[in-house]
Amino acid sequence: MDRAVSQVALENDEREAKNTWRLVFRIAILLLTVVTLAISAAALAYSMEASTPSDLVGIPTAISRTEEKITSALGSNQDVVDRIYKQVALESPLALLNTESTIMNAITSLSYQINGAANSSGCGAPIHDPDYIGGIGKELIVDDASDVTSFYPSAFQEHLNFIPAPTTGSGCTRIPSFDMSATHYCYTHNVILSGCRDRSHSHQYLALGVLRTSATGRVFFSTLRSINLDDTQNRKSCSVSATPLGCDMLCSKVTETEEEDYNSAIPTSMVHGRLGFDGQYHEKDLDVTTLFEDWVANYPGVGGGSFIDNRVWFPVYGGLKPNSPSDTAQEGKYVIYKRYNDTCPDEQDYQIRMAKSSYKPGRFGGKRVQQAILSIKVSTSLGEDPVLTVPPNTVTLMGAEGRVLTVGTSHFFYQRGSSYFSPALLYPMTVSNKTATLHSPYTFNAFTRPGSVPCQASARCPNSCVTGVYTDPYPLVFYRNHTLRGVFGTMLDDEQARLNPVSAVFDSISRSRITRVSSSSTKAAYTTSTCFKVVKTNKTYCLSIAEISNTLFGEFRIVPLLVEILKDDGVREARSGRLSQLQEGWKDDIVSPIFCDAKNQTEYRRELESYAASWP
């Protein structure tokens, strides 16, 4: 019995012990849960205090800023990569190509000279300073985006005058011609001793030189060889070209007035001459009876020629024999070029009739005045293998003075505005098999020339005229695909008289800010322009050789006007008719008059207008 009671008591003690430990475990679990909840609540409270809603809103902004910094850093690296690529893949090969081209030109020139030395001619090898390598005869400004007229000429810069001037009051220097190759330049003008109207006898000055850079970095033209052709030959209307053998020149030998020449039955005598690197001049008469058998008068175009495919190409114009094969081939052909935004109001049939008549002006007895291009093989023999190209009058206007230019790989032909169309014309030119082909021209509406009514500067309708003045444009601004965008030149900014020379950069419609030679009453005549770059400084310069009135020593003085081409934010001057009104926001660069001022400006201007308009 006691044993049974003890057994029951033992079981009760064990059950109470189990219940006690179970209670302890439950209390421990409960306490642990409470502690965990407390810690979680504290952590949550701390977290809420650290990241407020405003902080969460700012997170995207912070991410964006970081993204911008990363993008900027990557973009900077990309710019560096692009510049490296441009330098390695584009600029370096181009620089090497330009250097190679200059070296090859120099070697070609030297090889000709060595051959000449073998023939006992003896000569030196001229070449421009290294600063100009790759900066002559190239596309100087290649820009697809900038406004062409944001480029403009500086004030005229003082430099060494390489052109001789008259030394007496009756002296006259006129009709400049200039051409520059990668190795040297050539220049010529006519010298008349007894006034510019004397057509009986004249000299021809011819010079060969190179571009130099002074110790202070200034550009100057250095004449190395020159000659004054003072003999019994009356050379006129000469065109010059820089070739590997020196300075090639084409001239007419004139013994009568232009009107008398057109009324004659035989072509005008012409001569192909050359000033060699040794300073010796030689020339040869061309067989004009064969070469110009369909012509009654023929003259070089005054403007420079160009060396292309081992031939020298000269501009030529003159009168055709009526009913000759060349004349018949042009019968009924004409072209009408129109002014920008200024349409001729005449009936179309009347315009066509007047356009056709413009090729046969009454001044020359109704002869057809024709444009042409003459190419001659450049060799030690003068006048070798001459070939005459006569372009169709469905492309060219009435024949006139002109110039052949090469810039980069492109060739151009400038035609003086002697007919009704006042804006400057620049025809793209291609050559093949010794002949040239002219294509539809670039026109520069603001680059006009003065002319007699009805072919004055603002003229817009076809008419029969022989007027204007030689003022050639030089191709300056190009697209990257080599298409021409703009030109530099010095124009005479007057409606009718040869007055007011100004330099500017021109696009097809308008012109840049201008640089004046002097006052608006300054008399001037022919201008010819050429641009180049000093590669070392990356500065572009343009030279305008201009005939300027000079009442003290001679009636005209030929002045080489040098400007640097600058760039602004694209200010331009619009033109309708005349461009003599200044636009607000800019002013002309006015240079102090370089020649004498007249006391009686009113009477002086009247005389100037009458006198200037009388020049051919």
Swiss-Prot record:
Residues 234-239 are annotated as: Involved in neuraminidase activity. GO terms for molecular function: exo-alpha-sialidase activity; host cell surface receptor binding. GO terms for biological process: symbiont entry into host cell; virion attachment to host cell. GO terms for cellular component: host cell plasma membrane; membrane; viral envelope; virion membrane. It is a single-pass type II membrane protein. The keyword Hydrolase applies. Glycans are attached at N119, N341, N433, N481, N538, N600. Mediates the viral entry into the host cell together with fusion/F protein. Attaches the virus to sialic acid-containing cell receptors and thereby initiates infection. Binding of HN protein to the receptor induces a conformational change that allows the F protein to trigger virion/cell membranes fusion. Neuraminidase activity ensures the efficient spread of the virus by dissociating the mature virions from the neuraminic acid containing glycoproteins. The C-terminus (head domain) is involved in binding the cellular receptor. Homotetramer; composed of disulfide-linked homodimers. Interacts with F protein trimer. Interacts with host CG-1B; this interaction inhibits viral adsorption and replication rather than internalization. This is Hemagglutinin-neuraminidase. It comes from Newcastle disease virus (strain D26/76). The lineage of its organism: Viruses, Riboviria, Orthornavirae, Negarnaviricota, Haploviricotina.
